């Protein structure tokens, strides 16, 4: 029995050594690249498993799971830096890992998240040490003039995405690029919009998209949420959407939306004023732009959260009140 256990342990050790040897061999083999040089962008706050997937998706012939094993085995799993990397023919998994651990980026990245406010975007850009901060201390209106935009209020006008830049680049160029990207995406979506929508301009559609962005709990519900608000606009009903009220409260909002807040009139209070608010309330992504301009075919006028991130939609107030009692108050 003891002899059998010794053989079993020896076999297990041999298997581990063989696997380790296989990883070491693989780590030194050149990988295939879809182009050379190949620019690969690793997003900020990526896990080691996500880095392997981003490499593979970018056209690097690595096995994501093996790359993760290699990173952990070499103690580099938590040392990989975000940014743009230039990979050339002959690169191996080990050389790529070393490059990322040392942060040998050709470009740096700033990621702007869907649903952020302009204030949040400016805070992240201002905190990026690799940028030249030419807009620091500027008012929003001055920033818009600096990038050559005709608008004075920047809210919603910058496309949320991951942007590459070289060290020492001016933040003016980043803002200009994000602004131009939003203009292009918005105009492209406007050109493909559904018929008979209650928007007079692309800017109104952008405002609606920002509301959809803030109201959406599950991605698949965007077009239904858009349908509710579009239907209410058509009927001249109050939109009654909490995110606009919160935006209108500004710095005075403490995280708890009260009844008196819903009754306090501001230009953004859609419980007291009909129509859309005067500006967007956030930076909407492409999916929200498309939903605003191509809402689902539905007669729904109401929705309420089910408490799990999804929503219950209703076409009349009676059904809506029943849904509110069920999902918000726990009543049958």
Predicted regions and their residues:
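Residue-level detector of flexible, active-site-proximal loop/helix-junction positions
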Residues: 15, 91, 275
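Signal peptide-directed extracytoplasmic domains
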Residues: 23-186
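Intrinsically disordered, low-complexity sequence elements enriched in Ser/Thr/Gly/Pro
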Residues: 4-5, 51, 304
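Bacterial extracytoplasmic/cell-wall-associated proteins, especially those involved in peptidoglycan
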Residues: 123, 127-135, 145-332
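Short low-complexity stretches enriched in small and charged residues
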Residues: 6-10, 37, 77-79, 116-120, ...
């Amino acid at each position: 029995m003891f002899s059998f256990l010794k053989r079993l342990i020896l076999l297990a050790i041999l298997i581990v050594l063989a696997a380790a040897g296989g990883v070491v061999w693989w780590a030194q083999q050149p990988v295939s690249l879809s182009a050379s040089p190949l620019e690969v962008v690793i997003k900020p706050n990526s896990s080691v498993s996500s880095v392997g997937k981003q490499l593979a998706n970018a056209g690097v012939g690595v096995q994501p799971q093996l790359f993760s094993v290699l990173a952990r085995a070499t103690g580099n799993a938590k040392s990989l830096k975000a940014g743009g990397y230039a990979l050339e023919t002959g690169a191996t998994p080990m050389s790529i890992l070393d490059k990322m651990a040392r942060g040998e980026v050709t470009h740096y990245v700033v990621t702007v998240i869907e649903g952020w406010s302009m204030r949040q975007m400016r805070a992240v850009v201002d905190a990026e040490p690799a940028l030249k901060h030419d807009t620091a201390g500027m008012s929003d209106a001055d920033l818009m003039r600096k990038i050559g935009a005709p608008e004075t209020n920047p809210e919603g006008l910058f496309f949320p995405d991951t942007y590459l830049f070289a060290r020492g680049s001016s933040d003016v160029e980043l803002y200009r690029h994000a602004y131009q990207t939003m203009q292009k995406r918005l105009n492209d979506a406007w050109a493909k919009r559904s018929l008979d929508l209650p928007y007079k301009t692309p800017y109104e559609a952008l405002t609606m998209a920002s509301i959809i962005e803030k109201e959406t709990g599950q991605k698949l519900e965007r077009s239904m949420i858009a349908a509710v608000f579009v239907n209410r606009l058509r009927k001249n009903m109050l939109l009654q959407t909490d995110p606009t009220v919160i935006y209108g409260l500004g710095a005075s909002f403490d995280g708890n939306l009260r009844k008196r807040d819903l009754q306090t009139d501001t230009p953004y209070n859609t419980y007291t004023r009909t129509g859309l608010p005067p500006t967007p309330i956030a930076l909407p992504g492409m999916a929200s732009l498309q939903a605003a301009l191509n809402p689902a075919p539905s007669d729904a006028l109401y929705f309420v959260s089910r408490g799990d991130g999804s929503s219950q939609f209703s076409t009349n107030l009676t059904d809506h009140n029943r849904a509110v009692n069920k999902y918000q108050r726990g009543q049958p």
